[in-house]
């Protein structure tokens, strides 16, 4: 049984002791990282969240403390009191490496079984074991460092937005289900049998209502929930930095959030972000990078070849161009020597994105090697090489298709794939931000034969494009903007519709009947009858921001208690079966 503190107080954290503390008397508390018995001396590395301190016990210093120290094992929780002295052998790898604590008394606050995972940095353990014993995994210094960064980031966000006169307002966790996009997590109501709350996918409607309420500037660091199939860096519950502003246009929102990004990165990790951040229209992002999340850390941009091939007699390209399709290419520098098998693998890769194949031209010193060279004239080959600005040793990779989206997406993904394969991003700690703007307001779902909102139904169209809502909705651009960092979406937002008639028109374009629109969003439409201000906002993915600030590529590392890939918690075993009594109270019967 562990000993009680009985009034004993910790005077300093283990990791805070330095040379200036020599000759001071201190009490430290923490966990045993390691113990070494050298006969008449016992050395214990004691660890707390601030670091590791070496504690030395000697028979001649205090025999009782020495004998008790000999009984401790890894991860025992201790309180040790003694004098800070200079170490004989300095450990330059530790901030506390100049000093040690000479143990005069020791309390074993609790004992520990042999841990199923070793508490160290760079742990090589199966993810499910780490998640099952998460409380041990979180003792590791690298995990504690990440969660400290998370705390510092949240504080920096609050400090900045407070200076900008934003108010932090909490919005409901139990709200109305408005099924659009991802599935809602539903919560049955005991008071209203057969009815359900939904956990919010975002506070979108409430923050707009706060603008109608006259709060002017709102923010919240808030939990959101989506019951969707999990990808590598998705979690069923995640955190957003959510904000909204009244009486603003797009430039105002972008300016505010650029300064927020600059403040956070400088104050949390000391990195300077140059402003203003580059802006790129959606169409340019897609045509040059094949993605609405362009990674600007390397080149290999997509080039369109339609103009140089418009007169070609090569049947494959000619049919595509004549039928309104497109031909585009990327250039892999110094890859002309790539083997046929490697190139064939690249062809298989683009086929996973619906491309029909991959043509290629290797520009070698003594020849131009290509399976399509015999179908092209010398002038066409030269025009392609000139258009791609290819040098001797470069490899040109070409995709053609009737659908521009297939060409853009397949080359965009191939571009990213090659960057990894060629090591273009290795040891690259550059931060390349870009705003992507002028998104399409809606896109056409061919399977369901209807228009869908690209962001959400409350995004305002660009003023000059409103005229196309009735005749050509696909032509309408949105007042939407995403902030992208190194090819990852860090956040997104828009200027909102604040006019009831325009909002009703938007619902009409999306195929909502008036009755359906009022059933789902009547409270918002009703609020818009009472003088709503122009407003807009943005939400950052807080977890993803922490990934960039801490340098980890796994979202589970930035969340204290995450779920696994199957949305299951190995530690608590949630979700779990509940009692029949609880289900009966809710009027729920489980279908077998």
Swiss-Prot record:
GO terms for cellular component: cytoplasm. It catalyses: tRNA(Asp) + L-aspartate + ATP = L-aspartyl-tRNA(Asp) + AMP + diphosphate. Pfam families: GAD (PF02938), tRNA-synt_2 (PF00152), tRNA_anti-codon (PF01336). Residues 204-207 are annotated as: Aspartate. ATP binds at residues 226-228, 235, 489, 541-544. It is found in: Cytoplasm. One of its GO terms (molecular function) is aspartate-tRNA ligase activity. Coiled coil: none annotated. PROSITE patterns: AA_TRNA_LIGASE_II (PS50862). Gene3D superfamilies: Bira Bifunctional Protein, Domain 2 (3.30.930.10), GAD-like domain (3.30.1360.30), Nucleic acid-binding proteins (2.40.50.140). InterPro entries: Aa-tRNA-synt_II, aa-tRNA-synth_II, aa-tRNA-synth_II/BPL/LPL, Asp-tRNA-ligase_1, Asp-tRNA-ligase_1_N, Asp/Asn-tRNA-synth_IIb, AspRS_core, GAD-like_sf. It comes from the Bacteria. Its main location: cytoplasm. Its EC number is 6.1.1.12. Keywords: Aminoacyl-tRNA synthetase, ATP-binding, Cytoplasm, Ligase, Nucleotide-binding, Protein biosynthesis. L-aspartate binds at residues 180, 226, 455, 496. GO terms for biological process: aspartyl-tRNA aminoacylation. PANTHER family: ASPARTATE--TRNA LIGASE, MITOCHONDRIAL (PTHR22594:SF5), ASPARTYL/LYSYL-TRNA SYNTHETASE (PTHR22594). Catalyzes the attachment of L-aspartate to tRNA(Asp) in a two-step reaction: L-aspartate is first activated by ATP to form Asp-AMP and then transferred to the acceptor end of tRNA(Asp). HAMAP family: Asp_tRNA_synth_type1. Belongs to the class-II aminoacyl-tRNA synthetase family. Type 1 subfamily. Homodimer. This is Aspartate--tRNA ligase. It comes from Clostridium tetani (strain Massachusetts / E88).
